């Protein structure tokens, strides 16, 4: 944060510290001051969701922040929610030696990923000793005598800690958005492709503006909003071209269309197992697959989904290819 403060100072950006609320279009109140401006950009991020009446207590029931700064390693750990964050923590704590149970109410872990990748990820986690349970909800969770008691499928199990990884919602409390009539959707601010909210002159970027909640997406949204506010034309955000990475063991990276979302669209699917790659064999990391999805008629690359060692370093090639609307034929002619 000190580095960011220096950047602000270097670029002559005036910083006001305090709780802010938007009192009207073009007016923001910070403490006793009212700041007048032509445009307002909301970048307040997101906050962790609780699970119904089950709240994060910071002791035995953790959110992501508490899970990153534990005072002791839990011998038995329950993770509720198997999205990217839940899977990352499952991999991390299992590598440290915890006995990990990963619980997901959806039919498969990593519900945002292509189902082939999700299935391979579940197998990989299970092989590493993680107890993966899908299609299973949590009936109850409570801290009891320094431990956590969880009720799953009618059975009460005991853990040393639990991580709630059930998603986030935009941090909008106290901003005054309801009074202004700013449109919301499932806890996030609704924006157009130029990041403007339903109220002209008010913009939103980052996690508060909705999924995917990724830092590189927020940075790009900031560029779009700044250029728009400055009166410059800029290409709007194309959400189908945002790469996502999960830093688990093995890693997962993806961009574009998932096969299960194609409907009746004619596709050409490519699957390449990493055990057929010489470098993977030599390095001893043969686990995983690269899956590509092309339009069967035009040959356009529509999606790429990867699982394996260091695949987060490979996704950028597919990101560029999709951005340039590259075809299967053009990729085949490319020397990598």
Protein language model annotation of sequence segments:
Residues 17-19, 24, 44, 63-65, ...:
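Short loop/edge segments at beta-strand edges and connector loops
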Residues 24-52, 62-64, 69:
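Glycine-rich active-site/cofactor-binding loop and its immediate structural neighborhood
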Residues 1, 5, 69, 74-78, ...:
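Rossmann-like dinucleotide-binding cores of NAD(P)H-dependent redox enzymes
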Residues 20-21, 35-45, 79-80, 100, ...:
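Short hydrophobic core segments
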Residues 1-39, 132, 139-148, 157-159:
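Feature captures the FAD/FMN-dependent oxidoreductase FAD-binding
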Residues 61, 85-89, 95, 171-172, ...:
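Short glycine/serine/threonine-rich phosphate/pyrophosphate-binding segments
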Residues 230-231, 247-258, 263-336:
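Flexible, glycine-rich terminal cap/loop adjacent to redox cofactors
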């Amino acid at each position: 944060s000190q580095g960011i403060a220096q950047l602000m100072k270097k670029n002559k950006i005036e910083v006001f510290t305090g709780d802010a609320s938007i009192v009207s279009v073009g007016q923001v109140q910070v403490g006793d001051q009212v700041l007048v401006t032509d445009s307002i950009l909301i970048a307040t991020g997101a906050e962790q969701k609780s699970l119904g009446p089950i709240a994060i207590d910071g002791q035995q029931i953790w959110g992501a922040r508490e899970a990153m700064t534990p005072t002791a390693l839990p011998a038995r750990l329950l993770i509720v929610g198997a999205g990217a964050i839940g899977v990352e923590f499952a991999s991390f704590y299992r590598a440290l030696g915890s006995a990990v149970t990963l619980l997901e109410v959806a039919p498969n872990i990593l519900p945002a990923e292509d189902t082939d990748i999700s299935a391979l990820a579940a197998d990989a986690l299970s092989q590493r000793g993680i107890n993966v349970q899908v299609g299973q909800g949590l009936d109850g969770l409570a801290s009891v005598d320094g431990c956590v008691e969880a009720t799953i499928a009618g059975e009460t199990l005991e853990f040393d800690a639990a991580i709630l990884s059930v998603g986030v919602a935009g941090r909008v409390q106290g901003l005054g958005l309801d009074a202004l009539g700013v449109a919301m959707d499932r806890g996030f601010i609704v924006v157009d492709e130029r990041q403007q909210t339903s109220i002209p002159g008010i913009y939103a970027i980052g996690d508060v503006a909705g999924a995917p909640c990724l830092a590189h997406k927020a940075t790009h949204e900031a560029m779009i909003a700044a250029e728009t506010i400055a009166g410059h034309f800029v290409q709007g955000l194309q959400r189908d071209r945002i790469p996502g990475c999960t830093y688990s063991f093995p890693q997962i990276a993806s961009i574009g269309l998932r096969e299960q979302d194609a409907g009746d669209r004619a596709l050409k699917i490519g699957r390449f197992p990493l055990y057929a790659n010489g470098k993977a064999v030599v390095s001893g990391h043969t686990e995983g697959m690269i899956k590509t999805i092309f339009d069967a008629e035009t040959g356009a690359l529509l999606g790429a989904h990867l699982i394996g060692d260091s695949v987060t370093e490979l996704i950028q090639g597919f990101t560029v290819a999709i951005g340039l609307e590259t075809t299967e034929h053009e990729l085949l002619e490319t020397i990598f």
